[in-house]
């Protein structure tokens, strides 16, 4: 395996994004706005999650032409999404030269039984999780970066908060366990015990964990950092707002200075309307993207 395919290198690449904001973009123009605002990376896709949710049907990997246009337009890392379990979409993205692949529940799953074996790839993967069981399974498969699933395309932060709090609470529990308790907890979580042992030894996840799913305002981003996120993904929140350029800059600043409440108050002034949100409680079970994956 090439040196760039090792866990150490791939996880190190993800560590370099800590404290930053990664923004969804659908074309080169949006990618330039994101880079100018201070995004540490962009996620190239055909439609933002809000539009995927509204359109329904099957959501797939973006057209390679769109991804290549975004890659040519910016100097920051470019990520792209593959469907859960779709090995070939992931190989296509790797062949295009993207910097990260997101095996994403935002797209329609291709496999309802298996995720991609990410250790076969040189390019690092990011995956979503709702709890430590999901996080540990994705790490065992080779994920180099995690993010909360939240509820994408809603502009509602409540599920991202729930997922971040749950993962962190379960980490604290694991750290305090004895070896025999750890084995039982691995069974309860459906998690590989080797991953839980590494979490116990480190006192944290062995990979970075960003917040994602419903972040729409500078205050939302700061809240997720306050709860322990290593950084923030913003999907629909930027380009579904009234003023994408202002929102992008404000969210980047709020993420970097999440404990400076006077600054966040200043950043929040005169931004215009945030994206229109959806009450997650109103969604039918089949409309909840966070349920995808296992």
UniProtKB/Swiss-Prot annotation:
Which Pfam family, an example, fits this chain?
Answer: SOR_SNZ
Q: Which domain of life is it from?
A: Bacteria
Any one Gene Ontology molecular-function term assigned to this protein's record: pyridoxal 5'-phosphate synthase (glutamine hydrolysing) activity
Q: In which pathway does it act?
A: Cofactor biosynthesis; pyridoxal 5'-phosphate biosynthesis
Q: Where does D-glyceraldehyde 3-phosphate bind?
A: 165
What keywords would UniProt list here? Lyase, Pyridoxal phosphate, Schiff base
Specify the enzyme's EC class, one word: lyase
Subunit details: In the presence of PdxT, forms a dodecamer of heterodimers.
The protein depicted here goes by the name: Pyridoxal 5'-phosphate synthase subunit PdxS
């Amino acid at each position: 395996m090439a040196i760039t395919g090792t866990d150490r290198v791939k996880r190190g690449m993800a560590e370099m994004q800590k404290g930053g904001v990664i923004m969804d973009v659908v074309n080169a123009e949006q990618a330039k706005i994101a880079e100018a605002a201070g995004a540490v990376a962009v996620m190239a896709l055909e439609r933002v999650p809000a539009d995927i949710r509204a359109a329904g049907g099957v959501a797939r990997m973006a057209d390679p032409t769109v991804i290549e246009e975004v890659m040519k337009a910016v100097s920051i890392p470019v990520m792209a999404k593959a469907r859960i379990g779709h090995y070939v979409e992931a190989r296509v993205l790797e062949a295009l030269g993207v910097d990260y692949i997101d095996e994403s529940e935002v797209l329609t799953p291709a496999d309802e039984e298996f995720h991609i074996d990410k250790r076969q790839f040189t390019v690092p993967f990011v995956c979503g999780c709702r709890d430590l069981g999901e996080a540990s399974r994705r790490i065992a498969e080779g994920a180099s970066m995690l993010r909360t699933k939240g509820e994408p395309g809603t502009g509602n932060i409540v599920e991202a908060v729930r997922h971040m709090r749950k993962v962190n609470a379960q980490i604290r529990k694991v750290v305090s366990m004895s070896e025999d308790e750890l084995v039982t907890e691995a069974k309860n979580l459906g998690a590989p015990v080797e991953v839980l042992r590494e979490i116990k030894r480190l006192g944290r996840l062995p990979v970075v964990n960003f917040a994602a799913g419903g972040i729409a305002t500078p205050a939302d981003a700061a809240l997720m950092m306050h709860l322990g996120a290593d950084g923030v993904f913003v999907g629909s929140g930027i380009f579904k707002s009234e003023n994408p350029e202002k929102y992008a800059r404000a969210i980047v600043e709020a993420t970097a200075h999440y404990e400076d409440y006077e600054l966040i108050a200043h950043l929040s002034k005169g931004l215009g309307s945030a994206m229109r949100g959806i009450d997650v409680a109103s969604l039918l079970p089949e409309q909840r993207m966070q349920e995808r994956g296992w």
